Amino acid sequence: FNSTSSKNLIYPVPDLISHAASAYLFRNLTSKLKVCQQQFFILVLLGVFLPDLIARGSAFLDREIFLAAQYFHTPFACFFQTVVISCFFVKSQKAPVFWALTTGWILHQAFDIMQGVLGPGYYFILWPLSNQSVSFGLFPDSAWYCVAFLTTLAAFLTNKSLIKKIKAKIS
């Protein structure tokens, strides 16, 4: 792939904003879940970035390993990364940490699979069962600015403390 397309793959700022906003939106809609409580929510945020940490981060080190590193972006690899990270916590926290991270990377994968694929296709959701990239193509890759805006707006509009402040101002 050429440097122009790889540049688009490496610096997906609206993509990262959408992932972070999806975590906040999830927390706002399911605030009673343990993974959405303050002490574990930071791990949901880490989880939404987990697939890109190695997969996209590798491009900064060496563009030649970028394609091979995409396998760290798969649910299969994310599962094992989550297991390893969870092992560093005390026994009583391992399960909530695992579920918080897993919630994050599932949100990430869900957003990624909905978009049209950049370049030849890098979402190997079914790996190691299949080497075919998968995309539902619900919105084109060029729509990430709109998706980032709409996801962030939805996260703000579902924020309970913001809703209380707005209701107080109106009353």
What are these language model-derived features?
Residues 1-171:
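N-terminal membrane-targeting hydrophobic helices
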